[in-house]
From Swiss-Prot:
Annotated organism of origin: Phaeodactylum tricornutum (strain CCAP 1055/1)
Family: Belongs to the PsbN family.
Keyword Thylakoid: yes
GO CC terms, sorted: chloroplast thylakoid membrane
Transmembrane segments: 7-29
Bilayer topology term: Single-pass membrane protein
Name the record gives this protein: Protein PsbN
Compartments in which it is found: Plastid, Chloroplast thylakoid membrane
Length: 43
């Protein structure tokens, strides 16, 4: 494979991994421990 193809595959895999981890953190089992500052304050 050419170097450019390998770089594109690496960057794409990295972005997909970061996105997957972010979605898992936001909506997965650990999300119950996250606090929402907007729900803590009454208007």
């Amino acid at each position: 494979m050419e170097t450019a193809t390998i770089i594109v595959i690496f960057v794409s895999s990295l972005l997909l991994g970061i996105t997957t981890y972010s979605v898992y953190t936001a909506f997965g089992p650990a999300s119950k421990n996250l606090r929402d500052p907007f729900e803590e304050h009454e208007d």
